[in-house]
Amino acid sequence: MSNTPAAAASSSSKSKAAGTSQPQEKRKTLFQKELQHMMYGFGDEQNPLPESVALVEDIVVEYVTDLTHKAQEIGSKRGRLLVDDFLYLIRKDLPKLNRCRELLAMQEELKQARKAFDVDEKELVD
C-alpha cells in the first residue's frame, strides 16, 4: 500500500462509497438542476459534465450534513435546534453569515406582509 496523497484520497473515496446505502451510479440526485445553473453562473459551461455536477453535489451534501450534525450537537445541550446554532457555526465566514442574516430578515418581512394581508382580507369579509 502506498502512502501517497493520491492513494489516500482514492482509499477514502472508496470507503465513503462503500459506506453509502446506494451504489455510486444509482444514488438519488438532489440538486442537479440547481447546481448546473449555479455552475453556469460561476463561469462553467451551460451544460457542465454530469461528473462535475455529481462531484459538486457530493461536496454540498457533505457540507450541509456536517453542518447540521454540528448544529444538532450544539442544540442538544438546550434540547432543541435553533437557527442561532447554524449562525454560530458560520460566524467566522462573514459572507455566509451576512447572506443568512439577509435571508432571515427577508423571511421575517414576508411573514409580516402575509400577516398584514390576512388581516386586511378578514376585515373585508366581515
From Swiss-Prot:
One term under GO cellular component: nucleus
Superkingdom field: Eukaryota
Annotated region described as Disordered, given as residue ranges: 1-30
Statement: the UniProt record of this protein carries the keyword Transcription: yes
Record has NAD as a keyword: no
Keywords for the protein's UniProt record, in alphabetical order: Activator, Cell membrane, Membrane, Nucleus, Transcription, Transcription regulation
Principal subcellular localisation of the protein: nucleus
Entries under Gene3D superfamilies matching the protein: Histone, subunit A
One of the record's GO molecular function terms: protein heterodimerization activity
Phenotype of the disrupted gene, per the record: Embryo lethal when homozygote.
UniProt biased composition (Low complexity): 1-18
Protein name: Transcription initiation factor TFIID subunit 13
Gene: TAF13
